[in-house]
Each structure stands twice: as structure tokens, then as C-alpha cells.
A protein has these predicted regions:
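Alpha-helical transmembrane segments of multi-pass inner-membrane proteins
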Residues: 23, 102, 115-146, 156-225, ...
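Long extracytoplasmic/lumenal interhelical loops at the membrane interface
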Residues: 144-145, 263-277, 285, 289-327
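Transmembrane alpha-helices of multi-pass inner-membrane enzymes
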Residues: 19, 42-47, 170, 361-415
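Loop-to-helix entry and N-terminal half of a specific, functionally important transmembrane alpha helix
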Residues: 17-25, 64, 189, 193, ...
Length: 415
């Protein structure tokens, strides 16, 4: 049995502070507040390294692929033939690609396990539950007239809400309905959270979320419920519930019906096509290193302006085209390799073990990939938190499947 020393006592206090910050982060990540509790937790983790160094064993190639991805994106800043090397491009690169990695590196400075990770998802579920109630209240209060077609609850960015909906709700849904040793009360909490969020998602009027949830949730049901008759009944009930919610909101019904519209009748879709065409031209003109990270907006508004004026956009609302246009074939391939590897290890583990963690991660990864078709990952500054969350959940998955094993020397604890 370990004796309690001043050092072990200090480490215990630091661990409690770190976990408290993580809980606060899960409860506040949707709010526009000055304090980022995930960053605060990371800072205390760095302080913890002063007292003890973890023993790290990595059983995955993921960090090599992350390094390759970061290197290839950085090369676009140095070697692109559009702009010279500048601090502004470095700042954009840091905000979009470096800072969010805090989410995955925090696993090296705190001992995560399935119990404390589950506690964090209770916090995420509570945040989604409260925000969904706020969205529903806004809808029935008629706030859609004041705020336009996008309702966001306590959040102030529909892009952020869109991304986290597709990142986190699939995980909560898997935890709710997949047979596991999670307690009945917790599964009920997650299921109620999903139940309340369905109308909220519909009233938020973000079509890629309709598409992502509409594809991923039925798949989750089919893979989680072994009795296929029950699974089909569940899917039918889910569809009827969603249909009923759409009938309450004519605006949402119209938004849904325009998902596949590609002409000028739906300018939101049409301008995306124009941006995609411009991005493809950028890639064709600058195939190796692209136009450089942070240069898309300037090139789009000066050299690749579409025939019809669109909004003042800073990315093309498609991650692959964004990577190809800004970082060329090197960045595009490194991005694809990274995500293909994540799909490979998670699908391989699920087929091998049928475990709930792999199914939850695959579901989140698939939904987020769908989001990346018309929205953007690797956004910087005020909307970089979805990328941080993506890396955080990837870190959780690596820990839970022992791709990363963190341990501490007992002698160091007793010094």
C-alpha cells in the first residue's frame, strides 16, 4: 500500500483540480464564456509534469500520421507560390491545426479511464439537454421570427452547434441503446437527452445535421439492437417522431425539402457549389502545395471570384476541397490517410470485439465526416472547439482501446 507523502498528496490535489476543470468544460462548452476550462485543465496538467513524468506506451501509428498531417499543412505556408511567409499565416495555422491538438495531448497528463470519461459524457449530456430545452422554448416563443431560421439556444454559433451535434449526439445515442454494463439510470438519461434533442435539431434548421443524424442514427439502432424486428420498430418510431416534429415547423420542412436543390432557387446550396468550383480551380492551378493555409478568402475574393456574388466566406464549406486548395496534394493526402486510419482501427476493433466504445467512436466519426461535406473542420479562433473535441474524443478512444497506455512509477509517487 502506498504511503501518503507530500508529493503524492500534491499530485492528488492536482488530479482533482484537472478533473473538476474537465467537468466544468463538459457543462459549459456550449456557452460563450471567457474561460476555457479544457485549456485550464491542460495548464494544471503541465504543472503536474513538474512533479512526475508519466510512462507512455503507444501502440498505434496515429501520432506519426498526425505529425505527417501537421508537417504537410505547414509546408503549404512555406512553399506556396501565392504569398510570402508571414506571421498572419502562422497565426492561422496555429489556431486551426496546432491549438486544437490540446484535446488529444491532454490524455498524456491525466489518467483517463472509462469511469471518469463516462462522467464527462454525463456533463455533455446535461449541456445538450438544457440547450435543447432552450431551443424548443425559442421556437414556441416565436424567436425564429427575430433570429432568422437558425435557433441555437444558449449558444451563439449555429456552425459550432451543428458540429458538436454530429460529434457528440451519436456517442450519447450508442451509450443509451447499446447493451452494456452502463447503469439503467445513465442509459435513461442519455435516451431522454436524445429524445429532447430531436425536435431541437429540427428547429435549428441545419440541413447537414438532418442528413447526418438521418443516416447515422438508424445504423446505430441496427448495430446496437440484436433483435432486428425490435430494431426496425425502433427506426419506424424514430422516423415518426421526427416527422411529427417537422410538421410543427413549416420552415424546417422547407429546409429539409431543399437539401438536394442545386439551382438558384436555393442560394445557400448554389453558392456552396460555386465555392467548390473555385476551390477545385485553386487546386488545379496550385496542385503541390496549394495556395497556402489562410489564403483561401483572399484568393476567392480576388482571383477565383464566381460569376455570381456570394457571401464573404473564409472556407469553401467542404473539408477535403479546403485541404486540397490550401495545402495541395500533400495536405489532402495526409488528411485522407489520417481519417482512413481512424476508420480502420475503429472498424477493426468493432468487428473483433463488438465493443461499445468502437461503435460510439465510429458513429461519431461517420457523422462528423458527413458534416465535413458541407461545413468545415479545422476552423480557427472562435469556432475551433469542434476540432478540439474531435481530438479529445479520439484521445479517449485511444486510451479505452489501449492504443495509448499511461502509467506512473510507484517509486516516483512515494518520493
Amino acid at each position: 500500500m502506498l504511503s501518503i507523502t507530500p508529493k503524492s498528496k500534491t499530485l492528488n490535489i492536482l488530479d482533482k483540480i484537472i478533473f473538476s476543470c474537465l467537468i466544468l468544460y463538459s457543462l459549459t462548452f456550449l456557452l460563450d464564456i471567457k474561460i476555457n476550462f479544457l485549456t485550464t485543465a491542460f495548464v494544471f496538467g503541465i504543472i503536474k509534469l513538474i512533479f512526475i513524468r508519466p510512462q507512455v506506451r503507444i501502440n498505434s501509428k496515429i501520432f506519426y500520421l498526425i505529425l505527417l498531417f501537421i508537417l504537410c499543412t505547414f509546408l503549404s505556408i512555406v512553399f506556396n507560390d501565392v504569398s510570402s511567409f508571414s506571421l498572419n499565416n502562422i497565426s492561422t495555422f496555429k489556431s486551426r491545426f496546432i491549438s486544437p491538438l490540446l484535446g488529444i495531448f491532454i490524455i498524456f497528463i491525466y489518467s483517463f479511464n472509462k469511469y471518469n470519461i463516462n462522467k464527462l459524457f454525463i456533463g455533455f449530456a446535461f449541456s445538450f439537454f438544457i440547450n435543447a430545452l432552450a431551443v424548443i422554448y425559442q421556437f414556441f416563443n416565436g424567436d425564429i421570427i427575430s433570429y432568422g431560421t437558425r435557433l441555437t439556444g444558449f449558444n451563439n454559433s449555429y456552425m459550432l452547434l451543428c458540429a458538436v451535434n454530429l460529434l457528440i449526439l451519436p456517442i450519447l445515442f450508442v451509450l443509451a441503446i447499446h447493451k452494456s454494463n452502463i447503469s439503467y439510470k445513465l442509459r435513461l438519461l442519455y435516451l431522454i437527452t436524445i429524445f429532447v434533442n430531436i425536435p431541437a435539431i429540427i428547429f435549428e434548421n441545419t440541413r447537414i445535421v438532418y442528413l447526418g443524424i438521418g443516416i447515422v442514427f438508424p445504423l446505430i439502432i441496427l448495430f446496437s439492437i440484436k433483435n432486428k424486428y425490435k430494431a426496425i420498430i425502433f427506426i419506424i418510431l424514430f422516423s415518426l417522431y421526427s416527422y411529427a416534429c417537422f410538421q410543427i415547423s413549416p420552415t424546417s420542412t422547407q429546409r429539409f425539402s431543399n437539401i438536394t436543390t442545386t439551382n438558384k432557387n436555393d442560394f445557400s446550396n448554389y453558392q456552396r457549389i460555386l465555392m467548390w468550383e473555385s476551390s477545385l480551380k485553386m487546386f488545379i492551378d496550385h496542385p503541390i502545395f496549394g495556395i497556402g493555409v489562410g489564403n483561401w478568402h483572399e484568393q476567392y475574393t480576388t482571383n477565383y471570384t464566381p460569376p455570381i456574388k456570394t457571401g464573404d466566406f473564409y472556407h469553401p464549406h467542404n473539408v477535403l476541397l479546403n485541404m486540397l486548395s490550401e495545402t495541395g496534394i500533400l495536405g489532402g493526402i495526409s488528411y485522407l490517410l489520417l481519417f482512413l486510419y481512424l476508420y480502420y482501427i475503429s472498424i477493426y476493433n468493432y468487428l473483433k470485439k463488438q465493443d461499445i466504445f468502437s461503435l460510439a467512436y465510429i458513429s461519431s466519426l461517420l457523422a462528423y465526416t458527413i458534416n465535413c461535406l458541407t461545413d468545415s473542420m479545422f476552423c480557427g479562433h472562435n469556432i475551433k472547439s469542434p476540432t478540439t473535441l474531435f481530438w479529445l474524443f479520439t484521445g479517449f478512444y485511444l486510451i479505452l482501446n489501449k492504443y495509448v497506455i499511461i502509467s506512473y512509477n510507484k517509486k516516483d509517487l512515494n518520493k
